[in-house]
């Protein structure tokens, strides 16, 4: 899928806009991990480096492969390391819950990812490191590959949300979800 950061001239465009308009703040949507660029992140931050949003989508490599998000855990952790090394203090990670073939092991993978990113943040920015795990429930829409996938019921999603809330809290990550 197309990402804002795929544009070959995104950094020069951001730099030109922010130098032309002093009070302009530029934001980019959640970034695919495979197209993450510290240069883009730094251009957007323009001195203020708070929270960077990445979209790994699923908590396990098995499930990322199943949904064709060919991003490795190593890619994600490398992006987090680069951001924290350059002074960013927060990483928000966006995941989907209720994907076809998802198991509680996949849900636990989200928590584990939060734990690893938090550890990387602490290594580079100490107690200022903030990690937020944000999830949305899969709602099948027309035309994408999962248009005919069965949507998890509220009773199926509730234990996943509870596990994520408790698990994220135990590893020092914030958790939020959208129904």
Regions found by a protein language model. Give the residues of each.
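Conserved SAM/AdoMet-binding glycine-rich loop
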Residues: 1-130, 136
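Auxiliary Fe-S-binding modules of radical SAM enzymes
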Residues: 84, 107-179
């Amino acid at each position: 899928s197309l990402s804002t950061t795929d544009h070959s001239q995104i950094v020069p465009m951001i730099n030109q806009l922010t130098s032309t308009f002093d009070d302009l703040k530029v934001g980019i949507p959640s970034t695919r991990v495979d197209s993450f660029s510290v240069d883009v992140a730094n251009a957007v931050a323009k001195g203020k480096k708070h929270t960077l949003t990445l979209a790994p989508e699923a908590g396990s490599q098995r499930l990322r492969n199943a949904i064709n998000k060919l991003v490795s855990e190593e890619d994600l952790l490398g992006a987090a390391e680069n951001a924290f090394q350059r002074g960013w203090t927060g990483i928000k990670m966006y995941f989907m819950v209720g994907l076809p073939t998802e198991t509680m092991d996949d849900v636990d993978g989200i928590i584990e990812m939060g734990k690893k990113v938090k550890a990387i943040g602490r290594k580079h920015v100490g107690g200022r490191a903030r990690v937020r795990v944000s999830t949305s429930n899969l709602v099948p829409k027309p035309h994408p590959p999962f248009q005919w996938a069965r949507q998890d019921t509220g009773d199926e999603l509730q234990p996943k949300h509870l596990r994520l809330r408790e698990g994220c809290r135990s590893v020092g990550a914030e958790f939020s979800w959208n129904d």
